[in-house]
From Swiss-Prot:
This is Protein Lines homolog 1. It is linked to Intellectual developmental disorder, autosomal recessive 27: A disorder characterized by significantly below average general intellectual functioning associated with impairments in adaptive behavior and manifested during the developmental period. The gene is LINS1. Transmembrane segments: none annotated. It comes from the Eukaryota. Expressed in adult testis, prostate, prostate, spleen, thymus, skeletal muscle, fetal kidney and brain.
Amino acid sequence: MKVFCEVLEELYKKVLLGATLENDSHDYIFYLNPAVSDQDCSTATSLEWANTCGIQGRHQPISVGVAPIAVAPVCLKTNSQMSGSREVMLLQLTVIKVMTTRILSVKTEFHAKEQYRDVIKILLESAKVDSKLICMFQNSDKLLSHMAAQCLALLLYFQLREKITLSNSWIAFCQKNLSEYSESNKAIYCLWTLTAIIKEIFKDSCSQKTEILKQFLTHFDTIFEVFYNSLFSQHFENCRDTSKIVNILMCFLDLLELLIASRIHLKLHFTCQRILFLKPSCMLEVITWPIQAFVKRKVIIFLKKCLLCKVGEDLCRGSVPALMPPDHHVAVDMLALANAVLQAVNSGLLKTLSVYEKHSFFGGDEVQPECELITSPDHVILRAASLVIMKSLEIKFQNYSSASEVKVDLQRFMSELLTFLKPHLQPSLQLHNPCKWLSRVFIEQDDDMLEAAKASLGIYLTLTRGCEATESLTQGKEMWDHHTHENGYNPHCIFLFFLKNIGFDSTVLLDFLISSETCFLEYFVRYLKLLQKDWDNFFTICNNFDATESKYDISICGCVPSLVQDQSSNQTIPHRLTAPHSHRDVCARHSWASDAPSEPLKAVMSKGAHTMCASSLSSPRASQSLVDYDSSDDSDVESTEQCLANSKQTSLHQQATKEIQDAAGTSRDKKEFSLEPPSRPLVLKEFDTAFSFDCEVAPNDVVSEVGIFYRIVKCFQELQDAICRLQKKNLFPYNPTALLKLLKYIEVISNKTMNTL
């Protein structure tokens, strides 16, 4: 026993270091072959299994003269503690797991890797270790079961990588238990192992992932559909063992997410990868089951990931493969899922969705009678459900041919969504702009907020194109403006609320633009293109924001910012922006601001009347910038086609950059779009003065309130300057030249607007 444990410990240390083995590969099989009886899969109580389950006859234990190996301390039990068969098995499984991992690693030395490969092949072929591991992961000992499942998953992936015939015993085990799900308690073991293998495929850096996955899924394509139908056809309320269904459903969602991710990223089209899109109503019905809230939450989040094509990101330890170009088959499936979601919403799905989360308590799950229980909505479900509906609408409307049908459906579903959200958003949206729902629902999750804003903008643009194709530019304009506000998807309002949420801070926009996520870049580009065409409407909405907030005594950013007046200048900032004649008459069209006062926004406040706003024009975040923009020297104007040196451009960045190049490069005067930071008469000297953030009162006791239009223009100017300076230092991750052209054009039309005032 002592010698046996010493050999295992020494072998573990060698494999951990990736060192070569001194003995023949067959000599190690005796020590690595688990003590499991083939008859009853029970764990042996001693090491007497060597003559029955081990390799008999020829390969006897190695004569060990153990030499110490210098390694980092490892948590190995002493020989006396390892006397039990359980501890021996755990160490055996650990060695097998580490050895297999070493084989799959590119860092392992070639000779050592070949030795490890021989050992594992012998274990699989002669010792039938895969069959024993199948028995072991059904063990009541949870640790032993988990280790056995991990080892089995790695060994199966090893077989796939080495193009060895996949374990017949495991294939038979999975097919039997998945097809007999209702009678079997072992389906969860199959699901867990399948999930672990696909994770290994994603995690591996080899170039044959698609071929490996294709070989793997071939064995389970048919049986997986049978299991899917069986799982969702049962009536949950009539089941006795609900915990079994919950466990299997949670594990199944992880597996299904990886299958869909592999379908999107690796371009395979097995039925098991498409089953959700072929039968989406089955999954949606889970939300109506009398099941725990966390299960419904997982289902809704799963649907959100599918519609956003972000499946698999949280489950794969390694990086998910780069998103492939659009696939017609995937687009068709996404449309089927979107239609199913909207059909369920139309049938009253949101009315059955409870969003109040159950509170957890230390020491129990019930609140004491003397304690007050305050319930609050589950904002995770609110966000996920809202985004699922918005994305489904965007996908569905992309395939519509009639603008009138889009209008009718949009009004119906947005009414359903706003009615669903209304009880959970206080104060009520009716007091303010209905478009505010998006910023309030997603205030704690900026990535979901950007996805929702992008989807909303996509819906607006789709509907706009449809209306322009069937109506004149002026026909029905008033009704159109009213429709966008009433149904909460006006793109200008949504963008203004977004800027308010971030305090008009250009550094936040810069962070989003240089992020590895491209959602904001795509959204921002599309919005700037819209802004060029719809400037008058945007300007009017800015005025309406100021008027509405003045009526309800709501500051733009929660408190009134102070402007330090430049004593050397007699210029003052207009307190109210008067729209040019081309868009003055639009003000009254917006029902949410129709009763707003028309008086100018004026505020001259005494000392100490208001605290200083932390999100004023010169944001505190700007002083904490990663790059000292003011230290950058100006350089020559760069050409539109110039790429940044030493910068890595992803395919998505390139695609978005090309889009803005096409949009911004149309008939613009080259001199007008000079990329050098220009002198800007629009922002007056007082406006450009730095603010105080320690709640001090401005000199001369003058505190002025500035309209939202000025804040937006200032934010865009700061963003443009920051991008220019980063570009000159080759610090921007992609070529921003076309983006700068869009920002420059916005500045030009801003100046023209100011000149008309």
